């Protein structure tokens, strides 16, 4: 259908179909106004497309967290430092709180706190559990074993997204989780056979850290989505409250002053390395929080998991430790799980699709009772 009008200049304007569908409505928001602001520190990624944002965040995660992993393992090579994993966590929390406060102070636009304090009380507790237990586990485990456990973070994240956010996942997600669990089990068995530092208590510590980590990702995603909180706010309150928690605990247990005494003997190897360790970790957290905000917790976990696989390889290069070929095979199974998880984001495969496919295969393999109609006709003709 076409309708023609003449304007004041005498020229004819033709609208094809309904006029309302061809002319933009008045006061319609421009595409730029609909965009949600995405910033990492002072870098504005709002006007980049989704793929570019994802690739930039991935590059940042790999560079910063590879440095983070290297500095973390380097600190624990200092003789006598292994019992002070919780003190390292305290120093790390202090640095993170200062970094977050400085970043927030330099912002031109001050924004009041968005997320309720009771949510931050929970986040601080989970953050303390994640980082404290993870740092402490290095006193009992080989570094690659600790990292391979972290690679399987997707498993508790998957469970947490179902329980906390009520999300539904397809069969590929669960298959990825199974592959990761299998690879993790084989890697742990291999490490227990060749590593002189293997201790089952370390497995317990890192497992508890993963449970806290899974809850953090989902609670953060839900809170940031509902309250539109900036990254630095989440960091300041999560780590600031966590610092208070840990300070009180270490003061009551008497470990605070012993940690200070030891670190003052080696200030460069402890406080100095911890500064680089914390700075790279802080910047990495900003990028991971942006990934959580834009892509969701499971995909963010997949990116950080892939980075950890590279960290394991570099750990064997920079730090001497026993190696067995079983590390490689079990690690490849974990990588397969990572790939399946990434592929599941593109695939629309559901359990209903699998059920229909299984039914079709069953019909082809198992003949129907009484035979088909064509078979009956052939028998009658004979």
Curated annotation (Swiss-Prot):
Entry GO CC: endoplasmic reticulum membrane; Golgi apparatus; Golgi membrane
Pfam families, A to Z: UAA
GO molecular function, one term: 3'-phosphoadenosine 5'-phosphosulfate transmembrane transporter activity
Domain of life: Eukaryota
InterPro entries assigned to the protein according to its UniProt record, in alphabetical order: SCL35B1-4/HUT1 (IPR013657)
Membrane found in the keyword field: yes
Protein's UniProt name: Adenosine 3'-phospho 5'-phosphosulfate transporter 2
Chain segments carrying region Disordered: 1-33
Membrane topology: Multi-pass membrane protein
Function: Mediates the transport of adenosine 3'-phospho 5'-phosphosulfate (PAPS), from cytosol into Golgi. PAPS is a universal sulfuryl donor for sulfation events that take place in the Golgi. Essential for viability. Involved in glycosaminoglycan synthesis and the subsequent signaling. May be involved in hh and dpp signaling by controlling the sulfation of heparan sulfate (HS).
Protein location: Golgi apparatus membrane
Similarity field: Belongs to the nucleotide-sugar transporter family. SLC35B subfamily.
């Amino acid at each position: 259908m076409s309708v023609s009008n003449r304007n004041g200049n005498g020229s004819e304007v033709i609208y094809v179909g309904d006029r309302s569908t061809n002319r933009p409505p008045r006061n319609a928001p421009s595409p730029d106004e609909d965009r949600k602001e995405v910033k990492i520190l002072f870098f504005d990624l709002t006007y980049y497309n989704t793929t570019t944002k994802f690739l930039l965040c991935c590059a940042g995660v790999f560079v910063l967290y590879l440095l983070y992993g290297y500095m973390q393992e380097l600190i624990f090579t200092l003789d006598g430092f292994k019992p002070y994993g919780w003190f390292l966590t305290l120093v790390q929390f202090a640095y993170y709180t200062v970094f977050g406060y400085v970043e927030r102070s330099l912002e031109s636009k001050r924004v009041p706190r968005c997320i309720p304090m009771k949510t931050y009380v929970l986040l601080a507790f989970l953050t303390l559990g994640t980082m404290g237990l993870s740092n402490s586990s290095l006193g009992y485990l080989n570094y690659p074993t600790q990292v391979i456990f972290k690679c399987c973070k997707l498993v508790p994240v998957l469970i947490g997204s179902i329980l906390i956010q009520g999300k539904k996942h397809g069969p590929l997600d669960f298959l990825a989780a199974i592959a990761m669990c299998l690879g993790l089990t084989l890697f742990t068995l291999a490490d227990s056979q060749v590593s002189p530092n293997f201790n089952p208590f370390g497995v317990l510590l890192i497992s508890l850290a993963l449970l806290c980590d899974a809850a953090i990702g989902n609670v953060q995603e839900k809170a940031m989505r509902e309250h539109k909180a900036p990254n630095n706010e989440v960091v300041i309150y999560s780590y600031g409250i966590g610092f208070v928690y840990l300070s009180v605990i270490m003061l009551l247990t008497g470990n605070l002053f012993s940690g200070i005494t030891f670190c003052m003997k080696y200030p460069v190897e402890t406080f100095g390395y911890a500064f680089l360790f914390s700075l790279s970790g802080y910047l990495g957290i900003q990028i991971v929080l942006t990934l959580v905000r834009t892509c969701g917790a499971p995909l963010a976990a997949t990116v950080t998991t892939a980075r950890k696989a590279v960290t394991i390889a570099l750990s064997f290069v920079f730090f001497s430790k026993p190696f067995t070929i079983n590390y490689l095979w079990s690690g490849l199974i974990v990588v397969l799980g990572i790939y399946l998880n990434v592929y599941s984001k593109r695939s629309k495969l559901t359990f209903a699709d699998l059920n229909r496919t299984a039914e079709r295969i069953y019909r082809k393999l198992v003949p129907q009772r009484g035979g088909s109609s064509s078979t009956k006709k052939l028998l009658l003709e004979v």
